[in-house]
Amino acid sequence: SMMTTFSMSVLLPLYFEGAYGMTALVAGLLILPAIACNAVTSIVGGRVMDARGAWPLLPVGFALIAVGQIAISMTAASMNIGVVVALTVVVYAGVGLVLSPSQTAGLETLPAAEHPHGTALLNTWNMIAASFGPSLFIGLLSSSAATAGAAGAATDVAQAIGFATAVRVAAVIAVVGFATSLAYARRESHMSH
């Protein structure tokens, strides 16, 4: 989910600016509803995690991320900005349900004496994901946009195609996260009952 947050926060402005010719300010403002939704769902996710545990919170969150990204990848090339903004809210809602609760669920599996080491590992992997994700997805966007441009697509259309390709790959990663969370959260739920 850390990879999703940082990647989408970089890809979306590139998409809005490259495909629609928007200013950085307008592109940033279009992400604001998703960020606000993320803040709310982070609070909700924390409360649900405290009350019920990881099941069904993590699978639902990853499902929202995956479904939102799949839908964005299918609509981005058609350049329907309202749909992309709405689907971005769905993705960020899923991230809010996953980010902190997944870290809590991971730390809960460790003995108390190991929590500092677990926290250090989580922080390290979060930073790796936050660094790797945008690099990977910007590379995919750029490569795909260049290929589309070389095939004769207009610059704005090529940028939209590149964005759709990058989000499609991110969706595959989210589907893997969903499958993993389904197995993990269900196992944790059965072990606690």
Question: Each predicted region: which residue ranges?
Answer:
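Short, charged juxtamembrane terminal tails flanking transmembrane helices
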Residues: 189-193
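Interfacial non-cytosolic loop connecting adjacent transmembrane helices
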Residues: 151-156
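12-transmembrane solute porter fold
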Residues: 1-148, 159-188
